[in-house]
Amino acid sequence: MGRSNSRSHSSRSKSRSQSSSRSRSRSHSRKKRYSSRSRSRTYSRSRSRDRMYSRDYRRDYRNNRGMRRPYGYRGRGRGYYQGGGGRYHRGGYRPVWNRRHSRSPRRGRSRSRSPKRRSVSSQRSRSRSRRSYRSSRSPRSSSSRSSSPYSKSPVSKRRGSQEKQTKKAEGEPQEESPLKSKSQEEPKDTFEHDPSESIDEFNKSSATSGDIWPGLSAYDNSPRSPHSPSPIATPPSQSSSCSDAPMLSTVHSAKNTPSQHSHSIQHSPERSGSGSVGNGSSRYSPSQNSPIHHIPSRRSPAKTIAPQNAPRDESRGRSSFYPDGGDQETAKTGKFLKRFTDEESRVFLLDRGNTRDKEASKEKGSEKGRAEGEWEDQEALDYFSDKESGKQKFNDSEGDDTEETEDYRQFRKSVLADQGKSFATASHRNTEEEGLKYKSKVSLKGNRESDGFREEKNYKLKETGYVVERPSTTKDKHKEEDKNSERITVKKETQSPEQVKSEKLKDLFDYSPPLHKNLDAREKSTFREESPLRIKMIASDSHRPEVKLKMAPVPLDDSNRPASLTKDRLLASTLVHSVKKEQEFRSIFDHIKLPQASKSTSESFIQHIVSLVHHVKEQYFKSAAMTLNERFTSYQKATEEHSTRQKSPEIHRRIDISPSTLRKHTRLAGEERVFKEENQKGDKKLRCDSADLRHDIDRRRKERSKERGDSKGSRESSGSRKQEKTPKDYKEYKSYKDDSKHKREQDHSRSSSSSASPSSPSSREEKESKKEREEEFKTHHEMKEYSGFAGVSRPRGTFFRIRGRGRARGVFAGTNTGPNNSNTTFQKRPKEEEWDPEYTPKSKKYFLHDDRDDGVDYWAKRGRGRGTFQRGRGRFNFKKSGSSPKWTHDKYQGDGIVEDEEETMENNEEKKDRRKEEKE
């Protein structure tokens, strides 16, 4: 990255003339667009995505406006967007990673970095096609945008230099062979060199590639593809009659086209220096690949490099067809490979570029190109036929087989042209796809080995195996082969597609040996990529003539053939594996018959099974001569009769019985229902009550207190009173709950103001009687009042389990105006109850005193002492301590003065009584 910052603008300029200006204008508009809140995901998305910033920085991560825009972008005095929609940077500081707007140096790379989106034709074609030769092909920007040497990617930088070197190295060879020079210049000006030619090539290639990859033409049009100065798609038919040459070339081009895209996408070095030079021919002008042109074009010294890249290249290109898997894989691997290959090739060029004997390199190049072509063409057939032309020369079956393959190829072309969907394509594509996937993986593995090995260019791809020959021998052979191939292609062209078709179909059906051949070849080719070295060893043993693995042909009419191989399947497989053997003419009708025969065999098989079933049934499962229909109807009838028979008596009986029984039943049912409902109601009541544990406890307390007599000593009077009250129905409690709230508050205020000094016992008694009268209404209210006041009578202790309703807990706290408040909050429990272990363990947990009485007095006293606190502000209940009851505070406050228990109780009771009176 840093590399280019220094040259920020220059990088954009020279090589990129078009693209830069275009992108600049684009970015202006983009700026406008950015003011929309969405941050224009379209552009920014992919671009920023390739540089993987952590999400926060990716400007488009999820709109991440909130994350960084306000801070990073915000200019001086603007609110979110005021004055600044898209011009984030204008006023504010520009974070580096964002410097991606028109002026930023970054753009150099960011533009090219977005292969995923624009990979094929959209932007790139826009920028390239206009001034394509000027800008895009210039050495510097060989892969239009990416490679500007300044652009950040190290690969591209290297590439730039590499290209220069390559060019130097090639200076001489270029003069030598015009064709070659063309191929080398092509990277620079693919489109400069006469358009007619490129168009021509394009037609050929696109046509053929159209056949091969029916979808390919879309790719071909992209200016990136070597062959389309103008996207002209030729109808496949033209190509169908084309010679082997275009065929070969298309195999390359079909493969290379994608590879070109992928290169541009991945900045493959090949696009630029080495590829352009080395494989230049195969890449850019398919016509030169064709065997006819093979001889000169392949031979640049750079060739030495190209092959290293080529396989990778091809695999990359191919895989780029399958964008899902391939692109990603290749994008990753491609970068590294490219880097690696660039370095190596650079070195290689320097060392060998000039020194290598041009002649040798040429021949090797052609030979290599040949081999490459052969094993690149992983499509079973194209790959095959090319090989065949070479192979069979060695095997002396030259003429027939190559012709065959050629015919087949033409046949296939025509078929494909007619029905883009034909099986051949599908299966062919599959094989290719597999091949490609495999290749792209393999090429990684093989790449080092193959680089080393291939430098010697001495592979000859033979039918027999990869026979490794010394270049000297191979050169001659290759020349001859080239001639042969030319001858053959000419011959082939003459054949009419119809003948071819018929022959082909003939061949289709004898598929065994070719199948084998194809598989063999395919295996070999992948094998070769995988480990060229091993191939060397293998070469010796796998001479095809000796080791003949024959696949026993499965006769089509064999009745045992599994149904799975039905007509379509066979047809497809045979089409794919065109058979090279049978040359004699067989009318197409034979073939038609054959698949039918196979179909009929499956039918006959079914028929056979059916008859067997019938036979068995007749023999072993004889049924009474009843038809199924009869049998089932009889079942139905029987069931109907049965039901009717049963039904009528039942009905009558029911009628007879019903008046009494039904009445009985209904009565019982009604009672049950009533009972249930009552239970449910009761349950509901219980449930409601008990839903709140506190209610439950209160209820229990009530019940218990009922049993205990009211006649308890004055000491217990308040307790007993409470007991009387508690039994009251809970409903009343509920109804008075609210009242009690208000009353409670009033009580507190009043009682707090009323003096705490004890009044005479008599007055207290009066009050008690009044209270008892009130009990009905106040039951719970009282309970509540006293609850807090547990301190007065012994029971006081328990209330430390904060037992009251939730409100109560707090009331008590610091505000406790003596027992008064606390009364309001906690229900006081009668003495006996208090010690109920169920409720209150008399534990030191709650009291610091072991002695209960002390505790009581202490509490009462404390309460009283505290009472003064609130008296002044009588009106308000201070629930000061929120949730903790009095005892928590007291617990920590020392024991205070222990008063006489009686006295405290009396005082408290007095207070209670007084309060009640006031209430009344």
Curated annotation (Swiss-Prot):
First-listed, main subcellular location of the protein, grouped into a coarse class: cytoplasm
Sites bearing Phosphotyrosine, chain numbering: 219, 284, 383
Record's subcellular location: Cytoplasm; Nucleus; Nucleus speckle; Nucleus, Nucleoplasm
Matching Pfam families: THRAP3_BCLAF1 (PF15440)
Modified residues (N6-acetyllysine): 152, 332, 421, 437, 475
UniProt similarity note: Belongs to the BCLAF1/THRAP3 family.
Phosphothreonine modification, residue list: 341, 355, 402, 431, 494, 566, 661
Gene: BCLAF1
Bias (Basic residues) ranges: 23-46, 87-134
Residue numbers bearing the Omega-N-methylarginine modification: 809
PANTHER family: BCL-2-ASSOCIATED TRANSCRIPTION FACTOR 1, THRAP3/BCLAF1
Lineage: Eukaryota, Metazoa, Chordata, Craniata, Vertebrata
A single MF term (Gene Ontology): DNA binding
GO cellular component, one term: nucleus
Expression tissues: Ubiquitous.
Protein name, as recorded: Bcl-2-associated transcription factor 1
Compositionally biased intervals (Basic and acidic residues): 47-63, 160-196, 353-373, 384-396, 472-502, 638-656, 668-750, 763-785, 908-920
Family annotation (InterPro entries): THRAP3_BCLAF1
